[in-house]
Design a protein with these regions (language model features):
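Active-site helix of classical SDR
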Residues: 122-129
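SDR active-site strand-loop-helix element
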Residues: 7, 31, 56-59, 95-101, ...
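Conserved Rossmann-fold NAD(P)-dependent oxidoreductase catalytic core, especially the SDR/UDP-sugar
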Residues: 81-122
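Adenosine-cofactor binding site in Rossmann-like domains, unifying the SAM/SAH pocket
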Residues: 28-44
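NAD(P)-dependent short-chain dehydrogenase/reductase
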Residues: 132-186, 191-195, 226-228
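NAD(P)H-binding glycine-rich loop region in Rossmannoid oxidoreductase-like domains
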Residues: 42-77
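C-terminal substrate-binding subdomain of Rossmann-fold SDR/epimerase-dehydratase oxidoreductases
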Residues: 18, 174-175, 179-281
């Protein structure tokens, strides 16, 4: 059986990955803080010496308020690279790491994997730096390596500051939900699709950068109204088109994901939101 180490298995995306991994024939080994602190080099080294996986799927990173500028991004970049080296030293063959669309220099056109890079936060800088050093290391050490760039995310048990959770929670409490920048269009992808896409990528021989996205955008206004309509709370939703220096469109080109990796998203917005709401109502 194919043995894979999965990091971030309690996170928004990682927690959805175990089932598709098992369905694809992987034996899944969780690298959790309880068993192995990713920031502790000795523990990481011993973990990979013990398990000797052929595959590595890496989601673990800092999230939530303050994550974009937190100094922990530096530590996680270093720790993730050390983990890849430990993986390689113990017989590892293929690794897939998660990146972010915030590595890109945004434009109104759908972003392709070869689009210019211009990270605007420490988080994005360190993600991009990690990809560069891991890609170079993998090439020199005969490791099959891919970098999946995640765009916008929605799913189950989100942190309260995220847009989807904010809207749902406010409306369920019969309180006003305000969306200030309804004109912005974003490429949102359901966590079950994201995790399944990463598993498909891991189980392929595709190397390099791959956008993990729907390839389509939805305005924040349309997205919020869809949630409100499903909850029959349209009267509690307030939409503004406030001035902002944020890019109008952040949409990915998913041609490599769909044509080369062979992954097609399973869920549309309506079906995915129904799944999310069904666990709350």
């Amino acid at each position: 059986m194919k043995k894979v180490v999965l990091t971030g298995s309690t996170g928004l995306i990682g927690k959805e990955a175990k089932r598709p991994l098992q369905m694809a024939g992987f034996e899944v080994i969780d690298l959790t803080r309880k068993d192995c602190d990713l920031l502790n080099h000795n523990q990481v080294e011993n973990f990979f010496k013990h398990h000797k996986p052929q595959y590595l799927l890496h989601f673990a990173w800092i999230t939530g308020n303050g994550c974009l500028s937190a100094s922990l991004n530096n530590d996680l970049c270093d720790a993730s690279f050390f983990m890849l080296k430990a993986f390689c030293a113990n017989g590892g063959k293929r690794a897939v790491f998660s990146g972010t669309c915030f590595e890109y220099d945004f434009s109104d056109e759908p972003l392709k994997e070869n689009a210019p890079i211009k990270p605007r936060s420490l988080y994005a800088q360190k993600k991009h730096e990690l990809n560069m050093i891991c890609s170079s290391f993998a090439e020199k050490n005969n490791i099959s390596y891919a970098w999946g760039r995640i765009f916008y995310v929605y799913g189950h048990d989100e942190k309260q500051e995220r847009l989807t959770a904010y809207i749902i929670n406010r409306l369920l409490q019969n309180e006003i939900a305000v969306v200030n920048f309804g004109q912005l269009k974003r490429d949102y992808m359901y966590t079950e699709d994201i995790s399944a896409a990463f598993v498909k990528l891991l189980d392929s021989d595709i190397v390099g950068n791959v956008n993990v996205c729907t390839g389509e955008g939805i305005t924040l206004e349309s997205y919020a109204k869809m949630i409100a309509k499903k909850l029959h709370k349209e009267n509690l939703l307030k939409i503004h088109h406030a001035l902002t220096d944020q890019p109008l469109n952040i949409i990915g080109d998913n041609t490599i994901l769909t044509k080369r990796v062979g992954f097609i998203p399973k869920y549309d917005y309506s079906t995915a939101l129904n799944n999310i709401l069904s666990r709350l109502l």
